[in-house]
Amino acid sequence: NLLALFAGDPNMLIFAWVLVDTLEFVSALPGRRSNHSAARLPTVFGVRLLSTLALAAGTVSGWMVEPGFTLSAIPSQAGIFFLLAAGLRLGVLPLNLPFLQSAEEKNGPALLLRLSPVASSLAVIARLPANLLANQPVWLTLFKVLTTVAALYAAGMWLTGKSQHDSRPYWIIALAAFATMCALNGAAPASRAWGTALLLSGSMLFLFDPPIRRIRFLPILGILGIIGLP
């Protein structure tokens, strides 16, 4: 995960994504989980594969304009590919659930492994060019509509979830949609605030299961941390 977060060029990011996906796939082998979770493996890792291919396509597209570019200076014409690559992994563009959910991974190291693709994708969102889709207003409007739908749907599902565990993916999608909207509005660096809330406040909520009566005030502190977001 650190390799993906601190990757300076797209080649290193592709390698890191493949490595993380491979480790997660090995940990999610059908013999180690329920039949329901095993049935979702092709869908989840199919989405991950598409996101990696989109990242590779964006790398090639960027090289045609600026050979050897870094992730801190993504060419504008390659931005749409990087947006799709990150959006697929976050479940925002298009709306999907690229996360494995089972009782075996409620807490501990399994949760950290689940959040690895999320953290690396948020790092990509924060580095998207400021003029993303500036010359393609139709695509920009379409992506904004899709992102808004994803945010509203995920927020509703999170509020009406039967349990904290079942609502977890929708927390990720809802806040990731806010981060994506920042990039679509030309303020990609502002997405770091939403990404931080997703990971820090979200991790506190995720790990606080089942709740412990004596420290029930701790999740409230995590929620209060969102108040200062722009």
Regions found by a protein language model. Give the residues of each.
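Alpha-helical multi-pass transmembrane bundles of energy-transducing inner-membrane proteins
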Residues: 1-77, 87-92, 157-219
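Alpha-helical transmembrane segments of multi-pass membrane proteins
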Residues: 22, 119, 145-152, 198-203
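Hydrophobic residues within the alpha-helical transmembrane core of Major Facilitator Superfamily
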Residues: 50, 83, 125, 152, ...
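Short helix-boundary/re-entrant hairpin motifs in multi-pass inner-membrane proteins
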Residues: 81-143, 166-170
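Transmembrane alpha-helix interface/packing and boundary motifs in multi-pass membrane proteins
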Residues: 154, 158, 222-229
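Short juxtamembrane and helix-loop transition motifs at transmembrane-helix boundaries
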Residues: 5, 72-78, 100-108, 124-136, ...
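Physicochemical signature of membrane-embedded alpha-helices that form the seven-helix bundle of GPCRs
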Residues: 47, 81, 143-146, 218
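Transmembrane helix-loop boundary segments of multi-pass membrane transporters
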Residues: 134-139, 190-197, 230
